[in-house]
């Protein structure tokens, strides 16, 4: 397949692996304290496991997994608020499929649907808007979640709802922003992060220039990378070369998709509809300053929480689960005592096992047999 197969070419993959092996000797890092490269995107995590890229690295280079999966950081209380709204008479609650099985304290949206709530899977926010127009006697709620990748589509949908004066359409906001999260990670003492592989999809919207503070303020090299084996390995090579040269810069491996300035039209739509400020709670990580998203005054009439006023929910994570440590690269999924036994894809305890982009789900899918052996 054009534009895919050439980025999976085995000969070129092995050339990059050989180059990494050769250059790794020049790193100051050892097998006991390897160069720790955090891949922030769940898509990167799955590609790394699927193609076994982490097993090809020299012993003094390691991939660690970051909080780059928005479904994985959904707080239990937010799920419970969604269930409360979805269970009300006359409501059609629309969500992406990944969020259906995320557990809250009072179950999941899938369980709410089984109990009679009208919960529907949609593939875009425009699907939810069409449902609202087709069912004027019902109140239709779209559960908007995701990083900057999905925010432009939500913003454009809300613009359409305003222009068409759709009065029965509402938006439950769980959009969050990536950059404050990276700053929060680096502000933690002993974070152990030496370099970043930044997500291609988010960067397509915000550009590469937005990451400048990571290099200037925290002196960490960062490379925006694509999702195929050659992308990720080339990104690792670029980070290794920066580390050897004692440089901390933002580089763009994914130039075929990501412009340095990002997407100005998407950024303008987001700025029109959303206020990119405020605190937001992240599952396993707590409250992160300035990572929240709210509607601007012109769009506040679509705010589902203001309209339905669900009871405030704040649910503490089970202390047995190590979701927060996995999300910050402090432990591997299989090191959690609940992994594969209490928490597995059939009966997920944490969101990292539910989402198709979760590190625990990736480890279970590609490494569980090896781990059991």
Q: Which positions does each model-derived feature cover?
A:
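Hydrophobic alpha-helical scaffolding
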Residues: 6, 72, 143, 147, ...
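A conserved active-site cap/scaffold subdomain adjacent to cofactor or substrate pockets
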Residues: 172, 190-259
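Structural motif
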Residues: 92, 139-141, 195
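Metallocofactor- and cofactor-centric catalytic cores in central/energy metabolism, strongly enriched
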Residues: 1-137, 151, 155, 159-164, ...
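Internal helical hairpin/lid segments
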Residues: 234-325
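Phosphate/pyrophosphate-binding betaalpha-module
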Residues: 143, 147-210
